Amino acid sequence: MASIELSFIDYPKVTIDSKKELLVKIRDEAGELATQKKIKKGVVDLKVPVLREWIVEVFNGEKKVFNHQLKLENQVVFIKFENIALGDSILWPAYIEEFRKKYKCKVYLKTRYSELFEKSYPNITFLKKGDQLKNVDVQITPLMIIRGAPMLDSPPIVLNLEKGELRPKLDKPTLKRNIEKKYVCIATHSSSYYKYWLRKNGWNDVIKYLKELGYEVLCIDGDDIADYGLVKMHVPNGCIKRTGMRPLSERINDLHFCEFFIGVGSGLAWLAWAMNKPVVMISGFSNEDYEFKTPYRVTNKDVCHGCIRFSYKGKRGDMNDPFYCPEHYGTSRQHECSREITFEMVKEKISKLILSSSHDPQQAADQ
């Protein structure tokens, strides 16, 4: 008699111990074959961290000797993230809540910045550092980025949901306005050099322009200086610097009272988006379908751009290199996607935003 054991921890695994060779098939809930293998003794698995109601079939010749479909209803599902960035932390909870409702399961979530969501998603159990969870039925550690896919597509792919933009709900702290004058929040730093706006004097020109329009400018970057070895990136002068690794409750407070946000593709841009603030996103490394939708995205499409999508299609270069540039590394065109975004391009989007806001009664009421 063959021994067949199932596990859905990390990914579906079928452990076989049989005298005869058996055929193991793993299908998704739609019946699509995900993997199959003939085996006497060992493990058949599908090392893809996605959640499905997996179907496991085992055949002895033509005869089906085992059939099991995972049903997630009332199951304990543990979703854990490791080394997750702020933007990803903000992106996922709304989709996880939709997954919980679709499959009627008990979801436990381990992620950074859980203090942003605990009250807004009371039916998800957020685990703290050191918390232990026993008797887990299903567990995954999702990939943050699915090769070639926009960021907003990753949660639906992993969680088997319809694709679409879901804006999360945030727990808001007690709010207090700290700047009486109208102001704009900016964030100039990012996790890699190639994500910066590298136009010479670009940020200085933006700050000067905003001040001419009557706005104060508040920089909410985590650091004054980002050290990339060969290059140090400084926050611009001429603005109010509320930098430093402050609690996110302070960043939420700053963003709540601002008129709009200007930044690169960073976690603070995602935080502003989650708070329904208009976002001017300056980005050459990504296309408009990669992050959240904003009518105020600034990209120069007359030069090489959107390389974040190239990087998963066999292009050269190491994404761990902060100076990564898959098309033009080591040439005069390196990072032209960022350098060739001019102040005038950014100014045009700022002007469009201000004009739009002045004609939007709902947005005015939200301030």
Give the location of each predicted region:
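Catalytic machinery of carbohydrate-active enzymes
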Residues: 1-367
